[in-house]
Amino acid sequence: MLHSPIPTKADPMIFEAAADRAARAIPPVWPLMSSVAVNPFLGQAGETLAKAGARLARVAGIAITMPRHWYQQKIDTGEISDADLLAALACAPADLRPIDLAALKAAAALNPPRPQALASVADLAARASGVDWPGLLTERLGAWMAGYFDEGQALWAAPRGKSAYGAWRAVATHDLTPEIAGLRGFARHVSEAPETAMAVIARVCTRLDLPVEALETYFHQMLMSLGGWGQYARYKLWQAELAGGSDQTITDLLAIRLIWEEALFLRYGDQIGEAWAHVRVAHAAPVVATPDLMIDAILQDAAERAAQRELARILAGNAPQIHETRPLVQAAFCIDVRSEVFRRALESLNPQIQTLGFAGFFGLAASHRRFASDVAESRFPVLLNPALKSRAGGPYRAEDAEPQRIKARAKRAWGRFKLAAVSSFAFVEATGPIYVGKLLSDALGLPHASAPNDPAPQLDPALDLASRVKAAGAVLRAMSLTTGFARLVLLAGHGANTVNNPHASGLHCGACGGYSGEVNARLLAALLNDPDVRAGLTETGMAIPQDTLFLAALHDTTTDRVTLYADDHPCQTHEADIAQARTWLADAGRLARGERALRLPRAADETSISKRSRDWSETRPEWALAGCKAFIAAPRSRTATKNLEGRAFLHDYDWTQDKSFSTLELILTAPVIVASWISLQYYGSTVAPEAFGGGNKLLHNVTGGIGVVEGNGGLLRAGLPWQSVHDGQNYMHEPLRLSVCLEAPVAAISEVLGRHDGVRALFDNGWLHLFTLNEEGSIAWRYNGGLQWVPIDDTEDAEQRSKLKVAV
């Protein structure tokens, strides 16, 4: 195959375009303080699983499906049936799939070698010299990036004001470590490098004689070799573009990594030239799936079809009888899968308790400042920009916050003193005895963490009445809650209480940007209790009964305890309702804890659950969203009483009330995308923990205040820690792509997909599965790609299956 050499005076756009594509192939990672789940395959959404597998095998040496023995075990136990295998086989391209079921089963019994990435110049230099150049550059770059990206943790703060490339050059020209290891003249090489990152990239590519076709996957490989540091730089680009700007940090990191490649090539080029020529050709070749990768994709599809069969069986069960009487209480929870267990427990206590599911930020994208804080917390999905600003309110004067500010400053100063370059060495000896009491208290798990209880939040600046009415109406319509209001309506955000857990924010509400959801719930409750807003809603045809009280709550997913913010809206007429609600919530918590205890290691019963949240040695305080496999948007009556085992996102939706299908469009473009990020993060952290997992919690050290490394340095580890998906013996997350089930007309769903190419790509390329439910709640149609649908029919034979075209 002929490849296009880079001209001596190449158009800079060639390099810029390739660098930009490589950067967008990297998933972003949010800092620990507000970490959220991210789809690690975000940059491969336009490819099928098999093709993405080929790409990631080339650039990172990872497999993005499970080892074949995992599927073989499911085949042996009958969990994956022959019908599942046949259906998945029929969907695969004929030129790559096994010829028949027997051949597929024979392939499933084999264990092909795991993929190997193409060698970098550093890899080839290591083989030629015996020096671990990949390890050395990882160590040196990791140490520098920890300082450069530091958010206040480093002993010595890195100089500010320079680009990443400029800051690195200032350090690298004085770092003799590479030269001591054998890379003579490295500091001078760096000092003589071009002044801009793009000029560096152009020079290195020319010197390495890279064909134009090789640039994208080679650049992708270089950024993947930086681990979480590259992902954090991608986050900076994401945030900048969300605000309408741009950021060059990830391009700078690419240039830095390429300077190492160039220096090593100049040093060892004579010894590695032939091997490097083969690598160049391999990078320039088109990315295509191999028969082995297609077999893996077929087996993955079959495992998902088996799970979908089980989901269809559960949903086809008898629906509960709908009570026409007014509910005693309604409770709206986040769609988070952890709410499913609690909602089912709560509804079991009284048939007149009704629960609903809605995105946990309750439709209010607020940038919030807590009491006495100058930090603006983005309490909304990371896909959005803030639409509102809020702050902790209450009947206090501005000067009342000053003592809290002084206390916070003193705490920060004390923290800096503990970490300072000089004082840190004497800190333990000088102040250690002061901490004896705290150490004993923490070791015994004595502190009982309380729910956040700032003064009730308020919008600042306040919205005018018309805007408040519009916002309230939009939220209620999106919740499909426009009639049939109970006397007491609870709006329950969720959060988690854990100790000694750098990933604590990952247990909070993803829809709230990695924060707990009480602020959004309290803001909405205040909005819906406003008499003027209610009067305005009545004029629009949405009448809320005068005796309905909205009350915010916070569901602690670690302990299944619920805090009611009753003091926000004192109401003597509802004291009995609130007291009864507290009793029901406490009883539901006990039931939910009992069910969750069955899955948690060393959890004897429901009473042991609370202790886990206060145990600083506990690496698994809760399973969070491990096990998630389905997203269901339908009336609650379709899923009520059906045990979905805490594995389904549940969003209330009544398409008959959605005349323009604007709510359907909102669901497909927001909650479904957030759920897909969560599902695919768990998937990636399970199938490829070396690239997309957070590593071992027992080895974690927080670095820069933004992430964790294993040990004392190296690559930032992004993704979920191993303890979040595995209990030490078995996987607690089953890596399955999310099955999205919508009760809505097929034509309406297709119309929405036709308007949103990015959403459609996720379904067309198989990163998500899509189904419709009928009016009985049973799965009726499967999306077949290309805006085509096929009916679900258990009697479907192999000939009919051969017509299916869903991507694998």
Curated annotation (Swiss-Prot):
Essential cofactor(s): Zn(2+)
Keyword hit for Aminoacyl-tRNA synthetase: no
Lineage: Bacteria, Pseudomonadati, Pseudomonadota, Alphaproteobacteria, Hyphomicrobiales
Assigned keywords, A-Z: Cell inner membrane, Cell membrane, Membrane, Metal-binding, Transport, Zinc
GO cellular component, one term: plasma membrane
GO MF annotation terms: zinc ion binding
Topology term for the membrane: Peripheral membrane protein
Binding site for Zn(2+): C334, D336, H494, C509
Domain of life: Bacteria
Subunit description: Forms a complex with DabB.
PANTHER family per the UniProt record, alphabetical: INORGANIC CARBON TRANSPORTER SUBUNIT DABA-RELATED, UPF0753 PROTEIN AQ_863
Described purpose of this protein according to its UniProt entry: Part of an energy-coupled inorganic carbon pump.
Protein name: Probable inorganic carbon transporter subunit DabA
Entry's family note: Belongs to the inorganic carbon transporter (TC 9.A.2) DabA family.
UniProt key word Cell inner membrane: yes
GN (gene name): dabA
Compartments where found: Cell inner membrane
